[in-house]
């Protein structure tokens, strides 16, 4: 909106949302780096972004100094949502930025104790015969936005820590699990296969759902953003899906690209877009093509300091 007021996502979710704030800041820091050495108007924009970045109080979301970050805080309900964020899921970028903040930064222990759960985030296992190294919250292998949202700016290539020897390899394998599950197609949905895979959070046949590669959370809905935003991990397989979807363009393609989701089984082709799904397609295609957004975000000195921390 144009008022700056919060639009409640739910009754008690009517205040600060640190995860979504982190996604916003990730993008803004890339924009900052693009304009910081430009003309006077561009430099002024970069300065405004820098002020927003410095104003985010990451430390507040430790709820009294705990070594974990909480997702929500409400001016009317306080901490009643009570959602401490542990890994692994889409929220890694929140912990990276919280460590990187020059004004309201958190100590490294918040990452190690909260996100990594003192090492419990490490849980080597196989899904669809493919090796995964991390523990995925509530599931053996999560939806594909878990491999994408934190890495729109944060470059997974060469990124590692004591819990994961290669975040790029881990996210690639998470993507391959999703593809392999869709090819196996245990619920026998129409259309699923090597050229039509990709389960993630999107519009769904019954509203909105975080579709995942398991029989409980697979509703037969393909979300184009899932495979297309995976192009940095699986370029050939993602292009295979893109070509197939384009051959179905009368049903799944519109003025702003591929629609958010569809189900051949249910003959469900809603001509709707969802910005948080559309955005990663463009960003990840450009990262695959040139690495532009990765280079911009990773060049920010605060980000580098946070990663070293």
Feature roles, as predicted:
Residues 1-309:
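Ser/Thr/Asn(+Pro)-rich, low-complexity disordered segments
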């Amino acid at each position: 909106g144009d008022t700056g007021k919060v639009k409640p996502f739910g009754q008690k979710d009517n205040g600060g949302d640190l995860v979504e704030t982190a996604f916003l800041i990730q993008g803004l820091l890339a924009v900052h780096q693009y304009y910081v050495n430009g003309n006077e108007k561009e430099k002024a924009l970069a300065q405004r972004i820098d002020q927003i970045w410095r104003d985010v109080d990451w430390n507040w979301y430790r709820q009294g100094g705990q070594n974990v970050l909480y997702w929500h805080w409400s001016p009317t309900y306080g901490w009643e949502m009570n959602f401490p964020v542990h890994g692994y899921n889409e929220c890694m970028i929140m912990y990276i930025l919280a460590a990187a903040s020059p004004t309201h930064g958190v100590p490294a222990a918040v990452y190690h104790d909260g996100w990594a759960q003192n090492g419990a985030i490490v849980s080597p296992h196989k899904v669809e015969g493919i090796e995964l190294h991390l523990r995925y919250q509530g599931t053996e292998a999560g939806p594909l936005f878990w491999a994408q949202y934190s890495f729109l700016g944060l470059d997974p290539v060469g990124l590692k820590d004591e819990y994961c020897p290669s975040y790029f390899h881990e996210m690639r394998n998470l993507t391959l699990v999703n593809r392999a599950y869709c090819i196996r197609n245990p619920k026998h949905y129409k259309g699923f296969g090597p050229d039509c895979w990709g389960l993630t959070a999107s519009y769904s046949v019954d509203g909105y759902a975080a579709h995942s590669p398991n029989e409980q959370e697979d509703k037969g809905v393909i979300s184009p953003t899932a495979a297309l935003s995976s192009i940095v991990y699986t370029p050939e397989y993602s292009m295979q899906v893109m070509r197939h979807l384009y051959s179905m363009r009368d049903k799944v393609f519109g003025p702003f690209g591929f629609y958010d989701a569809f189900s051949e089984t249910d003959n469900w082709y809603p001509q709707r877009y969802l910005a948080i799904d559309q955005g990663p397609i463009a960003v990840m295609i450009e990262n695959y093509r040139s690495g532009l957004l990765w280079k911009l975000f990773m060049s920010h000195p605060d980000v580098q300091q946070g990663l070293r921390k």
